[in-house]
Amino acid sequence: MSQKYLIRIAELERLLSEQAEALRQKDQQLSLVEETEAFLRSALTRAEEKIEEDEREIEHLRAQIEKLRRMLFGTRSEKLRREVELAEALLKQREQDSDRYSGREDDPQVPRQLRQSRHRRPLPAHLPREIHRLEPEESCCPECGGKLDYLGEVSAEQLELVSSALKVIRTERVKKACTKCDCIVEAPAPSRPIERGIAGPGLLARVLTGKYCEHLPLYRQSEIFARQGVELSRALLSNWVDACCQLMTPVNDALYRYIMNTRKIHTDDTPVKVLAPGQKKAKTGRIWTYVRDDRNVGSSSPPAVWFAYSPNRQGKHPEQHLRPFRGILQADAFTGYDRLFSAEREGGALTEVACWAHARRKIHDVYISSKSATAEEALKRISELYAIEDEIRGLPESERLAVRQQRSKVLLTSLHEWMVEKNGTLSKKSRLGEAFSYVLNQWDALCYYSDDGLAEADNNAAERALRAVCLGKKNFMFFGSDHGGERGALLYGLIGTCRLNGIDPEAYLRHILSVLPEWPSNRVDELLPWNVVLTNK
């Protein structure tokens, strides 16, 4: 009997051992399942993060493509589509009203360009007139043979272009001898812009204006002169530009002093390609602009712009340029300006004012690519701020400040509360989240204008000044050296200041190149564009 129990016990122990082994295997399988599940969860999380990152990258690339497509093929206006549609509808209504009131028929079967045209503006009165008088071929009446008496005239004007022509001015200085002694006298030689140079001030002004105002590279100008029968190499033209810049340096220095002697300056910069000596690849230099323009507050002080070149974008360059300045600096959020707003700056910190146009542009780019309702609402709120600025443009500082305190402040407070709320629901890595974060990080500098009637809501004055440089980059693509960048900055400043004051740059350059060789150094301020009286010669 005991033997049977022993066998039974052994059998039970075997079964128990098998069950324990089975449980152990199940535990291993369960552990493997848990590890697999954890691995899959981790892989899923990584995949979701990768998908989210890819979606952001796709959104960013689509936005970049759309932006480049607009720049290449479409308008660069930042008006909302509904605003454009409203303007087009209003324009169409005004055209219809104008046709109705003036008695012009609006035949839908006739193309617009073939219908009766509106009154054409007369040609400018200051242009010289060349009269071509045409007499009838008939000397007597073609019907009855009677005598023809003068009745009147039928006149029409046509605008014609007289191409520029080169000419040689030969100066003959008469020499005379004394009849009693050996003394000889002769007329003194007139001064020239370039000592012993063959170019007159008019030709030099044409070359300078051609390159830095009309964006014609020197090699193209050389080809133009060649078609007129005069060989002027690109190297020769480059030497002329350099000599003219040396001559006009005192005027450029006077322009710099004028701009620094104000309470508010707009600044911005743009990259330019520069050939580096001994290297095949061009390096990237920088053109900085500094604008004095207080016309929006009704100031009678002439607007002016000064440019500077630097071989890089280090913050020490604007620090050096703005060393004598004290006041308001309107700029973007470039970190290189930070030391200018520090209390440790020599002479005291400048007052930082940011640019709403720059902030708005970031939101607008998101709206164009995504048609986001949140972005559209932000643009609408910002447009309300600009509507107030349009109303007060040209008013004195005190009146501008009063309106901003009463109306703009309320809108800014509401906008800030709304953006903070919306930003909390946006991904920090999304483009709209980045745009909102930019605005909120710059909030104090963006809102400063509401507490100062002199400050502006944006930095568009500086951005407009840089357009000439950007157009030049598209045509001659690079400066030949750092020295070339410096002389380009000088000419962009003088020409840009002429444009701001409605002065013909070529006529101005011709004048100062004519008088500078003998001009007193203590009266150079009299040669600033707004101080010069130009003739129509």
Task: Outline where the language-model segments fall.
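Conserved beta-strand -> loop -> alpha-helix junction used to position metal-binding or nucleic-acid-contacting
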Residues: 264-265, 333, 344-380
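Mobile genetic element proteins and their domesticated derivatives, centered on retroelements
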Residues: 74, 141-144, 178, 207, ...
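Gly/Pro-rich turn-and-neighbor structural signature
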Residues: 120, 135-138, 142, 219-324, ...
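Structured ligand/cofactor/substrate-binding pocket environments in proteins
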Residues: 201-205, 213-217, 235, 307-343, ...
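Short, flexible loop/hinge motifs at secondary-structure junctions
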Residues: 1-198, 266-267, 273, 297-299
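Short, positively charged, Gly/Tyr-enriched micro-motifs
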Residues: 62-64, 158-263, 495
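Short helix/loop capping segments that flank catalytic or ligand/cofactor-binding pockets
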Residues: 150-152, 186-189, 274-276, 298-300, ...
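Acidic/histidine-rich catalytic cores and adjacent linkers
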Residues: 326, 331-336, 372-537
